[in-house]
């Protein structure tokens, strides 16, 4: 890789992109407005960080709800087991739990983000605390840099890794979608995912967690989802891994 990329976003995807590029011997700049990298990563899995899943490529694809084949090339090159090897090489011992879910042995998401940040520093990735505003291109459409709120950063390639719109408090504000649209990319309508469900009559059961239970979701009388796992009652309905995967 001869191009010197700038990565926009210091979450899990941005840090991984910067590490992979830097390991190929190129100078990398990473832009992140938050004071700490991996802010959303640190709260995943109830603070434990569900790193990946220990299933093979075909099984992973079979469990993607929509258009799983789109991920075939990526998973073929770097699947869940490759992810496990990557983190264990960075000094994060892992364990496999029910459902083949993979967590750090310490049960601390911070250990995962800290390992990524250490690797960034070892590879001398330039970390810049700034919020990207837009990707700069010339009259031919070639990338020339990134305009930030504080400065402008020349770049021969840009990786948009800003996250979605799921948690504004962590920096996932949808800015990456806006920048992608400015570059001519098509942004499809976004809908919620990994969310709890509202249900009547659950308030009295708030806090009760059940394991090894079945869940079936109906829409207009038609069954649209069924699975088996762990469920948590809340004051407004149900949550937990079983529900969030629905």
Regions found by a protein language model. Give the residues of each.
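Phosphate-coordination loops involved in phosphoryl transfer and adenosine-cofactor binding
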Residues: 2-4, 97, 155
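N-terminal Rossmann-like FAD-binding beta1-loop-alpha1 element of flavoenzymes
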Residues: 3-30
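Glycine-rich active-site loop/strand segments that organize a redox cofactor
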Residues: 48-96
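Flexible, glycine/proline-enriched loop segments at strand-loop-helix junctions
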Residues: 71-74, 102-107, 162-170
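Predominantly flavin-linked oxidoreductase catalytic cores and closely associated redox partners
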Residues: 110-111, 115-246
